A protein has these predicted regions:
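Nucleotide-sugar donor-binding/catalytic module of glycosyltransferases
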Residues: 1-234
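C-terminal subregions of glycosyltransferases and related glycan-biosynthesis enzymes
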Residues: 222-334
């Protein structure tokens, strides 16, 4: 529709590669085939950081950069891992574009992926308030040959929100489209620790702005033996990983919230009069994060944790996960 047309606007796709030669061409081709220019008037640029590949990935990147010099650029980085790689891409991303998106190296994007995200970002935009906006969608799980596999585990039962983000990440990084405000906030104070880069962006947007989770699936999320992070397709492995998340990752989640609180203080110090960081709703959310950190683990804090559950409505998406989470939170194991 004409109302969504944005002449001369640009979206920059940020991709991190590491030993990705097997599926990289298919991924890049699907990005180049996006219809955001035709549907939205928004041009596309692809900016790639290689994280020290040793399988010839760089040759493929050279090939595409030479063939599409106006659309694709890349640079060689040291091996620092996927989280730091994406935050470095944020640091080096183009200041002048309006939208940003993350990309993995081994998926397949449906042609409407970016235009769907841009359209929703525009729908969420309040031009009187500069707030961080994040769009993400449900990933379609596929095998190495892009054949659909069991997708029950990608379905979300509840809404996206900060009360969910403090204990669970539902944002798959490669489905993200964000506005410049969210990118700027992440760039200003990158975290010293986060469980995963996409989880950090979920926390930022759900605390200070808006998140839209699209149940439509615009990305084929490839599952194979070498992808660094992905969903597990084995039900047994899925259950074991769920238990592991509750038992092992709870400390990382608390550590992540502590870092989130630290950076909130930096935002306030830099812009003490900015109502984006200093309003009743944000203060309520930060207080929730603070209480989860302060009253974790020790048995004597069980009454406090009961009160937190009652007054805040913290939740996980899946019913079984929510029950297990509440039990371990109240028992003092969290």
């Amino acid at each position: 529709m004409q109302i969504y047309w944005e002449e001369n606007k640009v979206i920059q796709v940020l991709m991190s590669t590491y030993n990705g030669k097997d599926y990289l061409r298919e991924q890049i081709d699907s990005i180049l085939a996006q219809n955001c220019k035709e549907q939205m008037g928004v041009s596309l640029k692809l900016f790639i950081r290689d994280d020290g590949s040793k399988d010839g990935t760089q040759k493929i990147l050279d090939e595409y950069a030479e063939k599409y010099p106006d659309k694709i650029s890349w640079y060689q980085g040291e091996n620092i891992g996927v989280i730091k790689s994406f935050f470095e891409l944020i640091e080096k991303s183009d200041e002048k574009v309006e939208y940003y998106a993350f990309s993995d190296q081994d998926d397949y994007w449906h042609k409407e992926k970016l235009s769907a995200g841009i359209k929703q970002i525009k729908n969420m935009t309040n031009y009187d308030v500069k707030e961080p906006l994040l769009y993400c969608c449900s990933p379609l799980l596929v095998d190495e040959n892009l054949k659909e596999i069991d997708n029950k585990m990608t379905r979300k039962e509840k809404r996206a929100g900060f009360e969910n983000a403090v204990v669970e990440n539902i944002v798959t990084g490669c489905t993200i489209v964000m506005n410049k405000k969210l990118r700027d906030m992440a760039k200003a104070y990158p975290p010293k620790f986060t469980v995963m880069h996409d989880w950090w962006f979920y926390l930022l947007a759900s605390c200070y702005g808006k998140v839209y989770y699209d149940k439509n699936q615009y990305i084929s999320y490839r599952q194979h033996g070498t992808n660094t992070v992905g969903y597990n397709t084995s039900k047994v492995k899925e259950f074991k990983d769920r238990v592991k998340r509750f038992r092992g990752n709870r400390q990382n989640i608390t550590k992540q919230l502590s870092e989130f609180i630290r950076i909130y203080k930096l935002y306030n110090k830099k812009e003490p009069d900015n109502t984006l960081f200093f309003n009743d709703e944000v203060k309520r959310k930060i207080r929730l994060a603070y209480e989860l950190v302060k009253y974790s683990k020790k048995v004597k804090y069980i009454p406090k944790r009961v009160a937190i559950l009652k007054k805040t409505g913290i939740y996980r998406q899946r019913k079984i996960d929510n029950i297990i989470f509440q039990i371990i939170l109240l028992s003092g194991s969290y």
